[in-house]
Amino acid sequence: MTLNLAQRVLNQESLTKDEAISIFENAEIDTFDLLNEAYTVRKHYYGKKVKLNMILNAKSGICAEDCGYCGQSVKMKEKQRYALVEQDQIKEGAQVATENQIGTYCIVMSGRGPSNREVDHICETVEDIKKIHPQLKICACLGLTKEEQAKKLKAAGVDRYNHNLNTSERYHDEVVTTHTYEDRVNTVEMMKDNNISPCSGVICGMGESNEDIIDMAFALRAIDADSIPINFLHPIKGTKFGGLDLLSPMKCLRIIAMFRLINPTKEIRIAGGREVNLRSLQPLALKAANSIFVGDYLITGGQPNEEDYRMIEDLGFEIDS
């Protein structure tokens, strides 16, 4: 079957939502053929470069939200809890990031949103990091923020703000009830209004439909997220979705390919759950994605850095530093 999707996309002819759902669900369209189309687009915009990102879990487990995927949810009785870490620990993480060719360092806090004191703590730390590592991009992920807090983060040197949509608007209330889909969209838009690069992505494998998956990709196109992390559910015992099966590696590849075709110019990152869902097919994901998280995630482990570097080298790709 001749797809010709890449040429259409490169000619600025966007796929429609109905087309995308049909392509995604069509069993006659081979996953590797679809991936090759995505690779043509990825190569056009990013060549063989791979961006590296690293996470610091700066505050853990102190959260009143009931997100069904999260081991830090209010529903979880047993979880790792600690308040916002000292500035020196955050700075040490920045040093580690620089030493490991990481381009973006992500400072993440649990909870609905930060207090003004916590924002000041982060801002002071970021200002110090930028003096020593001016080339290191700083991404903050602090939850739902206020306008004045966003202005402070921008002034301190925060380059990017992550706030994932996580799922489709239709499926949102199955995932969390303590905040709305609109809350998430508004947070992303507020960061854009304050000239902070928006990072927003998804978690696939929470029981959503194929239509939901495609809706997510189009929603992210609509809000114009610069960076799109694609997480695959890593089920955690005790959470609402803890008993769900992992996605198949081939479905994961199909998802990543569709996100690339729908958001051709964006940084697309394979993120949490990639190791357990993609398994031995992880390297193939970089035919569509151009970015990965290196090291551990918030409360689940990643594979050793050396394996990620080897994967990139074996593909004939190179780190985008």
Curated annotation (Swiss-Prot):
One of its GO terms (molecular function) is 4 iron, 4 sulfur cluster binding. [2Fe-2S] cluster binds at C106, C139, C199, R269. [4Fe-4S] cluster binds at C63, C67, C70. The keyword Isomerase does not apply. InterPro entries: Aldolase_TIM (IPR013785), BATS_dom (IPR010722), Biotin_synth/BioAB (IPR002684), Biotin_synthase (IPR024177), Elp3/MiaA/NifB-like_rSAM (IPR006638), rSAM (IPR007197). Residues 45-271 form the Radical SAM core domain. Its EC number is 2.8.1.6. It catalyses: (4R,5S)-dethiobiotin + (sulfur carrier)-SH + 2 reduced [2Fe-2S]-[ferredoxin] + 2 S-adenosyl-L-methionine = (sulfur carrier)-H + biotin + 2 5'-deoxyadenosine + 2 L-methionine + 2 oxidized [2Fe-2S]-[ferredoxin]. Pathway: Cofactor biosynthesis; biotin biosynthesis; biotin from 7,8-diaminononanoate: step 2/2. It holds the Pfam family Radical_SAM. Keywords: 2Fe-2S, 4Fe-4S, Biotin biosynthesis, Iron, Iron-sulfur, Metal-binding, S-adenosyl-L-methionine, Transferase. Homodimer. HAMAP family: BioB. Catalyzes the conversion of dethiobiotin (DTB) to biotin by the insertion of a sulfur atom into dethiobiotin via a radical-based mechanism. This is Biotin synthase.
